[in-house]
């Protein structure tokens, strides 16, 4: 019915390990959403992204290939940083991990990289003013 349709394999929490029983069909591409890496900061509070992505992302890329691969990041997902409660916390973007992430994804051949941006609406502006995402944009 839709011969050119595409659908993502969403690699997220319980689906980070590549499937072992099936292979991706025609039109299935990888969408990597590495939320788990934000739940495991190291002793300095800096998230340990490289080991997790080497463990999961490389095998996923081997299975799905880089064609149409996408990353859905959480760099400015203030809902997560606010523990999914209101009022939102102030957003602090550290550009260095964003730069490292982008460089790593690009080294694997992934060009389409996006991020969630949540809890940055009117209630955030009423508390803190317009969200400062300058550090995030500078990483690109």
Language-model-detected regions and their locations in the chain:
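Catalytic-core regions of glycoside hydrolase
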Residues: 1-140
């Amino acid at each position: 019915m839709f011969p050119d349709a595409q659908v993502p394999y969403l690699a997220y929490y319980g689906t980070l390990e590549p499937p072992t029983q099936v292979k991706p069909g025609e039109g299935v591409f990888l969408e990597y959403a590495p939320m788990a890496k934000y739940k495991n900061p190291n002793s300095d509070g800096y998230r340990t992204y490289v080991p997790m992505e080497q463990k999961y992302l490389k095998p996923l890329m081997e299975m799905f290939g880089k064609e149409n691969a996408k990353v859905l990041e959480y760099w400015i997902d203030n809902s997560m940083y606010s523990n999914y409660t209101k009022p939102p916390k102030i957003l602090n973007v550290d550009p260095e991990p964003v730069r490292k992430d982008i460089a790593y994804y690009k080294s694997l051949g992934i060009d389409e990289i996006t991020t969630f941006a949540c809890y940055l609406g009117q209630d955030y502006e009423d508390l803190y003013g317009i969200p400062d995402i300058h550090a995030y944009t500078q990483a690109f």
